[in-house]
Amino acid sequence: MKKFIVLIYGIIAYLVFLISFLYAMAFVGNFLVPKTINSATESTGISAVIINLLLLSLFAIQHSIMARPAFKAWWIKIIGKPAERSTYILLSSLALLLLFWKWQPINTVVWEIDNSLFVWIIIGVAALGWLIVLLST
């Protein structure tokens, strides 16, 4: 019974990951979702920058701490080895979904590429990055 519960937990964790992964692609790619990284309609100012930095920091800190061997060893004692990876995936995905939900788009161009060759290079590098993230799970 315990193995079955851990299996269901793992499936749920990976479904949440899949949702956050697909949403991340749309959020960063500026398509298909109601709020994207670039969807500001008015100037939002320094408060948006601070909120966004805090959201990014929360994700980065959670993601980095839980990946450390010392934390994993401690965490496995609490939840068990079979559920460790699923918990890491679930909490990282939830932190990312929180980032999307609370993100404050900024109505300022941070960078822009006009050369079509460089645009395609950036798109290719981005696609490779998404593929690496997907395959690393």
Identify what each model region corresponds to.
Residues 1-137:
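Membrane-anchoring alpha-helices and their flanking helix-loop junctions
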